[in-house]
């Protein structure tokens, strides 16, 4: 869930909408999932795309992830399809669970005209902070996980360098529209050529590692959640997102990740483009969607600084 990105008491979706979804969920569970005997549905998390309810059941506490809408327009991406998102969450969580990566166990995926939702274990937290070192260890384990048996079809153009190049250009176009900055990048083909040096190394990337998406207990990571942004690609793409988002101590994280060589074998300009991909996404999010002024200003300046740095390294 993307709770961290919401501003103070500002609610993107109304309580009325949440109650309507809760009632629909309760009705379907009472009719189609009688064996679970789910009771006492309560909201435990709200994000940009989903709301999560907790309910007591015959299998213990369960979490129900319910999209706010089936499709959503997004300045940073193509049309967001929540059904694809739920399928992705279910598939990647099941695979990671089978490989010993900490994720909630998936119990079911319900898709219907009335409502879509994902059923998983409800993992509890004591809200004790998780050290960046431990997060680094976890991400290293994820990046080193074999993906030969992962039959996940990324809904993107191949190779990954083409997809990221096109995404950066699209995001910059949106950024220029809302800021009037007039940022100019090399053409898509040039960016793709620069990024293509990393196409051969592939692993599963979470692409949104931050405290809001890590459930911890007693300082240990109990579960990674929210695989909406996940990709298969070079680990540096995931690492630069973590660095640019800056919600985790970078030096401490790297100590836990234990692979400094990854930053030396890849051309610096690749890292800059990967950082730009995240910075412009956050600028667009905070300026146009969430309207959080100080963060919008910060990432607007980051985009401009990264743009200058990229041209110095071309």
Predicted regions and their residues:
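An alpha-helical support segment within catalytic cores of ATP-dependent transferases
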Residues: 20-36, 145-207, 305-306
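Juxta-kinase regulatory segment immediately upstream of eukaryotic protein kinase catalytic domains
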Residues: 2-40
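Active-site activation/catalytic loop segments of kinase-like enzymes and analogous catalytic loops
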Residues: 236-263, 275-294, 302-309
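Conserved catalytic motifs of the protein kinase core domain
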Residues: 59, 115, 200-202, 220
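ATP-binding pocket architecture of kinase catalytic cores
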Residues: 42-159
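Active-site Asp-x-Gly
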Residues: 203-204, 210-211, 215-268
């Amino acid at each position: 869930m993307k709770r961290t990105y919401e501003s103070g008491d500002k609610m993107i979706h109304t309580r009325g909408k949440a109650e309507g979804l809760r009632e629909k969920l309760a009705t379907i569970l009472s009719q189609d999932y009688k064996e679970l005997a789910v009771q006492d549905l309560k909201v435990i998390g709200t994000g940009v795309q989903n709301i999560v309810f907790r309910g007591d059941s015959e299998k213990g506490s369960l979490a129900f992830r319910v999209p706010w809408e089936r499709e959503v327009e997004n300045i940073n991406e193509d049309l967001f399809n929540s059904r694809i998102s739920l399928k992705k969450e279910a598939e990647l969580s099941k695979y990671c669970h089978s490989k010993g990566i900490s994720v909630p166990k998936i119990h079911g995926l319900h898709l219907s005209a009335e409502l879509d939702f994902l059923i998983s274990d409800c993992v509890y937290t004591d809200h004790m902070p998780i050290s960046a070192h431990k997060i680094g260890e976890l991400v290293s384990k994820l990046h080193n996980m074999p993906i030969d048996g992962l039959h996940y079809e990324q809904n993107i153009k191949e190779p990954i360098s083409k997809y990221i190049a096109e995404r950066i250009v699209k995001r910059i176009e949106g950024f220029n529209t809302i800021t009037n900055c007039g940022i100019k990048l090399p053409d898509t083909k040039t960016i793709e050529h620069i990024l293509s040096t990393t196409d051969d190394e592939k692993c599963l990337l979470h692409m949104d590692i931050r405290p809001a998406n890590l459930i911890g207990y007693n300082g240990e990571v109990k579960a990674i959640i929210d695989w909406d942004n996940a990709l298969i690609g070079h680990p540096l793409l995931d690492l630069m997102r973590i660095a640019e988002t800056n919600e985790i101590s970078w030096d401490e994280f790297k100590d836990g990740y234990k692979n400094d060589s990854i930053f030396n074998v890849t051309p610096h300009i690749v890292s800059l483009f990967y950082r730009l991909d995240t910075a412009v996404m956050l600028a667009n999010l905070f300026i146009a969607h969430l309207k959080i002024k100080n963060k919008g200003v910060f990432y607007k300046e980051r985009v401009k600084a990264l743009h200058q740095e990229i041209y110095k390294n071309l």
